[in-house]
Amino acid sequence: MANPDHVSDVLHNLSIDPTTKALAPDSETKLQGAYGGNGNDFLLNDELVEATKIGKPSLLSKDGGVTKDKGSNLKKLGYQSAAYNAKGSYGKGAYAYGYYPPAYQYPRHGYTGSYASGKTNLQYQYLTQQGRSAGNGQSYGGYMDNIYSNYGMCGPYTNGYGYGSYGYDSWKYMPNWYAVNNTYKPRNGYHGYGKENIEGLNEMNRGPRAKGFNSQDGSKVMAVSLKEQRVTETEKLSEDVSLLDPKDYNKIDFPETYTEAKFYVIKSYSEDDIHKSIKYSVWSSTPNGNKKLDASYNEAKQKSDGCPVFLLFSVNTSGQFVGLAEMVGPVDFNKTVEYWQQDKWIGCFPVKWHFVKDIPNSSLRHITLENNENKPVTNSRDTQEVKLEQGIKVIKIFKDHASKTCILDDFEFYENRQKIIQERKSKHLQIKKQTLVANADKGVMSKINLVKPQESTTASEDAAALGVAAEVTKESKVVKETELPVEKNAVATAC
C-alpha cells in the first residue's frame, strides 16, 4: 500500500504526478494500488499537474486510510469513471486535459450528448439558445458529418435527429486537439468542418431529397452550423418566389448527335450554387477555369457549322451528376454576382440548363477519358475536358436515365437557405462596418493623445520669429568673417 501522504498527489485524468510516478504498480504484476493503474509514461507538465490538484475530490478517508472505491476501482490512468453519474454526464471536480482516443468518451460530453452541470468554457452557446438535449444523441460509434449522415444525407433527417458523443467531429471539441492539428481551429467564432463558410452554413453536397423527403410542402429546413445543429420550422415562401417548371428540362427531343461539340466537367462545392445557377442561368468558375472556358467558347463560335459548349455538373463528394447545361455566352471577367455561397468567385457567364437529373456515378463510371490517364469521367477535376465521343455518350445517358429525383425537388429548401445566407451576410457586413468605424475612432483618439500639445501662435508672431532668426544668422556670419587667425602657442585675449 502506498504512503497516504502521496495519495493526495494522484491526478484525475491522464497521468500521475512525476514525484509519485515511482509508486505506481507495474503492468506486469497486474497490481492496482491507490493510483488505480499501471505506470503511464504520458506525463503532464508541472503547470497542468498543479492545475489538476485544485478542487479535486479527496482520496483519503476520515481515518487517513485509502478509500477502496476511490482507489482500487479506478479505471486505467486517463479514463476516470468515478466522475460520471448514471446519466452519463460529467460530474464536478474533474478536469479534462490532454488527448482522448476516440474509443473513450470525451469527459465534457455525456453518453447522450448532454453537457456538464458545472460551469465550464466548453459549454458552447448555440444560436438557437436551446443547446443539446439529452436523449437526442447517437450513442454508437459511426462517423457523422456536421450535416450529413454516413451516406452524405441531410442532417435534419438522420436517425435520432442529432449527434452524440461519438459523432463525427466530436473530437474537434476536445481542448487539446488543436495542439495536434490546427486545420479545424474555430474561424470567426464558428466551429466547422472543412468547407464551412463564414456565415456558418456548411456547403451541402446533397439535399433532403437524398433520403426520400420532399421539401415542396413549404417546410423550412435549415441545415446549419455546429452551433445550431438542427432547426426545423414551417414557413411559407414569399410571394415573389416562383418555382421552376420541371417541364422546361429533360426534353426527350433533345439532340444527341453532333459533328462538333465541346464538353467540360464542372465540379461545384455545393448544391446551393447549383440551385443559384439554375435559378439565375449563370455560372462562375475559378480564375483559370473561367479563362479556359472563355477560350473554348470563343473558339467554338468561330466554327461555321456550330459547336455548342456543354457543361456536365457534379457536386464534390456527392457521388452523382446533377445536370447538363450549355454555355451560351462569353465570360464577363469584370462582373461578379453576390449570391454565391462564398464571396470568392470573380467573373461569370450565362448558361442554359437542358437536363436536371440525379445521375449516380455508377451509371457513368464506364466512360473513361483518354486525355485524363483513362480515368472514369466521374473521377474528373473542375473544367476537365471530355472528348466528343465520350461527351455524346454522357448526353445519351442523361436522356435515357429514369431518375426519380433532381435538385428541383429541393428548390424551396435551397430558397430558404439562400435567404438565411443573405441575411447573415448582411449582418456580417454591418458588424464589420461598425467594427471598422469603432477602430477608426479609437485610432484617431490614440493619435490625439500621442501628439504633444503646442502653444498656438499668430501669423505675426511666426513672422517675427523668422525675422529674428535671420538677423542672428546674419550677425553670426559677419563675426566669423572678421575673426583673425590665432598664431600657434599664442594666447587669445578675452573679450
Curated annotation (Swiss-Prot):
Gene3D superfamilies: ph1033 like domains (3.10.590.10). Expressed in the shoot apex, at the sites of leaf formation, and in emerging leaves. The keyword RNA-binding applies. CDD domains: YTH (cd21134). The keyword RNA-binding applies. Changing residue 283 to A: Reduces binding to N6-methyladenosine (m6A)-containing RNAs. GO terms for cellular component: cytoplasm. Disruption phenotype: Aberrant trichome branching with an increase in number of spikes. The double mutant plants ect2 and ect3 exhibit delayed timing of leaf formation and altered leaf morphology. It holds the Pfam family YTH. It comes from the Eukaryota. GO terms for molecular function: mRNA binding. Keywords: Cytoplasm, RNA-binding. RNA binds at residues 267-269, 273, 283-284, 316, 340, 345, 353. Residues 261-398 form the YTH domain. InterPro entries: YTH_domain (IPR007275), YTH_prot (IPR045168). It is found in: Cytoplasm. Specifically recognizes and binds N6-methyladenosine (m6A)-containing RNAs, and regulates mRNA stability. M6A is a modification present at internal sites of mRNAs and some non-coding RNAs and plays a role in mRNA stability and processing. Required for the correct timing of leaf formation and normal leaf morphology. Required for proper trichome branching and morphology. Functions redundantly with ECT2. This is YTH domain-containing protein ECT3. The gene is ECT3.
